[in-house]
């Protein structure tokens, strides 16, 4: 099992409507891309010094499934229309989950 974690920092000009649209589109991802085994995302709670504004956690059975998700047309369209213009930076990590 592979876990993908992406932490996003917004641009200074991002609006609440853009964040809501981003989150709503993310919520639909597992319905369209059936390779996703677990999918969670949410805004930082600002409980301490934050390094990111939003996080996504997704699990996949294999590395190949992760790459298929990454290149899936729905995911690519999401990045182009709902993400790239509001994200100042993103940190990603993928790792194997212990059996």
Q: What feature does the model see in each segment?
A:
Residues 1-41:
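N-terminal first-folded block
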């Amino acid at each position: 099992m592979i876990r993908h974690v992406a932490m996003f920092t917004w641009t200074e000009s991002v609006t609440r409507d853009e964040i809501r649209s981003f989150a709503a589109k993310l919520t639909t991802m597992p319905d369209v891309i059936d390779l996703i085994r677990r999918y969670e995302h949410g805004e930082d709670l600002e409980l301490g010094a934050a390094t990111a504004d939003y996080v996504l956690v997704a699990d996949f059975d294999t590395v190949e499934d992760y790459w298929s998700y990454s290149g899936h047309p729905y995911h690519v369209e999401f990045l182009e229309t709902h993400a790239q213009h509001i994200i100042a930076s993103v940190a990603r990590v993928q790792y194997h989950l212990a059996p």
